[in-house]
Amino acid sequence: IDDSSLNAFAAPGGIIGVNGGLFLNADNEGQFASVLSHELAHLSQRHFARNILNAKDRSLTSSLAMISSIALALTSSNPQALAVGQAFLQTQGLRYSRLFEKEADRVGFANLIRAGYDPKSMGEMFENMNDLRKLAGEAPPEFLLTHPLSSSRINDAMNAAEGLSREGTK
């Protein structure tokens, strides 16, 4: 995609989109491959389909949360009580997103290693992403992020790579 921002995504039907910024910000093939392996993991783990199923499961909980917050707002004469229900719903959706991201990191890392790439490639790419975020001044609170905070992802990836041989890797 003709866009200089660092991004890639997986979509239903086996589609992976890659912004031009990935080419600009990956220092080597292994780092580029780490992003693709992450996106392929979203597809292989059926995250889009599982998210739809989870949304169905959450619909009853969501309805109860909204009814409760409306009742609380009416009985307490505090309209801000509605925000509690909305915050709960958003938190539940983000929780599933973060779980899927962590799973995609883990499965993507395993596939990256099986493909013969340097185990440190994923952590190094996360460092690049974190550096770009800092330069852009983008640091929303972690509870608002769909992706785990980059420093957490860097640590997880580097710890997974610890002790794995870099010899003979791409």
Which stretches of residues belong to each language-model region?
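Short alpha-helix carrying the canonical HExxH Zn2+-binding catalytic motif
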Residues: 28-44, 64
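Catalytic Zn2+-binding segment of zinc metalloproteases
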Residues: 40-57
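Acidic/histidine metal-binding catalytic segments
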Residues: 52-56, 79-81, 116-126
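Catalytic zinc-binding patch centered on the HExxH motif and its immediate surroundings
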Residues: 2-14
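Acidic helix-start/capping segments at beta-turn-to-alpha-helix junctions
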Residues: 1-4, 54-62, 125-132
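Membrane-active amphipathic alpha-helices enriched in small hydrophobic residues
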Residues: 60-76, 83-92
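Short pre-active-site segment immediately N-terminal to the catalytic Zn-binding motif
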Residues: 17-34, 94-99
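Extracytoplasmic and endomembrane cell-envelope/extracellular-matrix remodeling and assembly machinery
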Residues: 91-92, 97-170
